[in-house]
């Protein structure tokens, strides 16, 4: 491992952020810290993850939502101090890593099936040999 990777891993450990497991197709709620003058508040951005970019400290993801009939996409840096929390609302069942095709779709054709049996997977614990 080279020096840059070591420094990035130390920085990630220092940030001590808990990041949930999410994938493209999942519906997430991203709570963003917004500063307006002297006031600081949380703003929720709820949408579908259409892309995920894993690059260590520079990891990011794109969330798409429809607001007032207009498609809105926002790119978030995973380890940004502006992100208060990421909450996975619903797991999506998709077969692609990048869901850019959703940009050209609207209505029912833009819907994503929900992945069933996700809660059962979390409950399974490894069996210990006696």
Swiss-Prot record:
UniProt xrefs under InterPro entries: Ribosomal_bL19, Ribosomal_bL19_CS, Ribosomal_bL19_sf, Translation_prot_SH3-like_sf
GO cellular component term, pick one: cytosolic large ribosomal subunit
Alphabetically ordered keywords of this record: Ribonucleoprotein, Ribosomal protein
Record GO terms (molecular function): structural constituent of ribosome
Gene3D superfamilies: 2.30.30.790
Gene Ontology biological-process entries: translation
Family as reported in the entry's similarity comment: Belongs to the bacterial ribosomal protein bL19 family.
Protein function: This protein is located at the 30S-50S ribosomal subunit interface and may play a role in the structure and function of the aminoacyl-tRNA binding site.
NCBIfam families listed in its UniProt record: rplS_bact
Protein name (database record): Large ribosomal subunit protein bL19
Species this protein is from: Polaromonas naphthalenivorans (strain CJ2)
Recorded name of the encoding gene: rplS
């Amino acid at each position: 491992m080279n020096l840059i990777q070591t420094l990035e891993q130390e920085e990630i450990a220092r940030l001590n952020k808990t990041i949930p497991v999410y994938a493209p197709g999942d519906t997430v709620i991203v709570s963003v810290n917004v500063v307006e003058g002297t006031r600081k508040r949380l703003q929720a951005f709820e949408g579908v993850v259409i892309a995920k970019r894993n690059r260590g400290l520079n990891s990011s993801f794109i969330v798409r939502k429809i607001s007032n009939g207009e498609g809105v996409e926002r790119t978030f840096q995973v380890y940004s101090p502006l992100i208060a929390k990421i909450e996975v609302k619903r797991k999506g069942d998709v077969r692609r890593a990048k869901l850019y095709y959703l940009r050209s779709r609207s209505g029912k054709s833009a819907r994503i099936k929900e992945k069933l049996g996700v809660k059962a997977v979390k409950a399974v614990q490894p069996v210990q040999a006696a």
